[in-house]
Amino acid sequence: TRQPTKAATAINNKMLTIIQNINSGRLSVRMRKAAILACFDGKQKLSTVCHIMCGFRLKHRRIMDFFTAWFETPWLYAAYIALPACLLLCAKPALKAWRQNPQAFGILLCFFAVFWSLGAGLDGGQLGGLRYHLLGVALGSLMVGSAAAFWLAALFMLPHMLLTVGAQNLAAAPLNVLAVTLPALAVAELLRYAVRRFLPPNLFLYIFINGFFCAAAGMMATGAAITALLSQSTVFAAVDLWQQAFPVFFLISWGEAFLTGMFTAIFVALKPQFLLTFDDDFYLSRQNTIWPSES
């Protein structure tokens, strides 16, 4: 019998949890084959294992675009209940934001299309073939408010998933929306409240914290939520996602932060009416100065 290499020892140990379920009938024939394959070939890429387990390949697929086969039914059903509830709670403020500036909604949809098409990933290792994309959620929260940004992201997720994972995986769309958008929006709301509550009304603070820093922190929060969620999936049982997948979110958070901060500064200078959360009277009044000696 072929013995696994030292590099595959950790992977093989985690695959034992899958093997233990083989006799219980919880795994399909494909998953049984994948368990055996992973144990005797620890260098096998996760994309190949997933192809055997679930019938799809992970090449050029994004870890932030969910497949239905990644999750058990209770997770999907819970998302079917949670997403409509969240949308209902956000409906009134989202409608108010729409009435104030509908043009900003169209611009934000264009930003979503651009941000979500910009991706990065690793080509080697167990997670070779998986891709990550930017969000633009922090920018959306500044433009139309968190409630409206959540609605737009939920609507945009449908055509996005049709193009990336296909109609057969739309059942995972509600869970995808919750995992990708809610953490980043929660961070945006928290930081924006902290800036207005505890810091002086400074234009630099608005751009740097609400734009740059908030986008980076939101991406990290989304990455943590996705990693924690996918860690519960048997498809990724052979991989330590916290060590191999989560660090990538830290890298792409810089791109998210740079683009969000740049567009925030542009809007403040040229089109402040596109920023629902920006108030000229609050941030640009004469008594607000950068240096104490100017007052």
Give the residues covered by each predicted segment:
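Ser/Thr-rich, low-complexity intrinsically disordered segments
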Residues: 1-17, 24
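Membrane-embedded alpha-helical hairpins and interfacial helices in multi-pass inner-membrane proteins
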Residues: 64-69, 196-269
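Hydrophobic transmembrane alpha-helices
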Residues: 65-140
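Hydrophobic cores of alpha-helical transmembrane segments in multi-pass inner/ER membrane proteins
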Residues: 80-87, 142-144, 181-192, 254-265
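Short helix-perturbing small/polar motifs within transmembrane alpha-helices
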Residues: 85-90, 162-223
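Alpha-helical membrane segments and adjacent membrane-interface helices in multi-pass membrane proteins
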Residues: 118-184
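Short, highly charged, low-complexity non-transmembrane loops/tails of multi-pass membrane proteins
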Residues: 267, 271-294
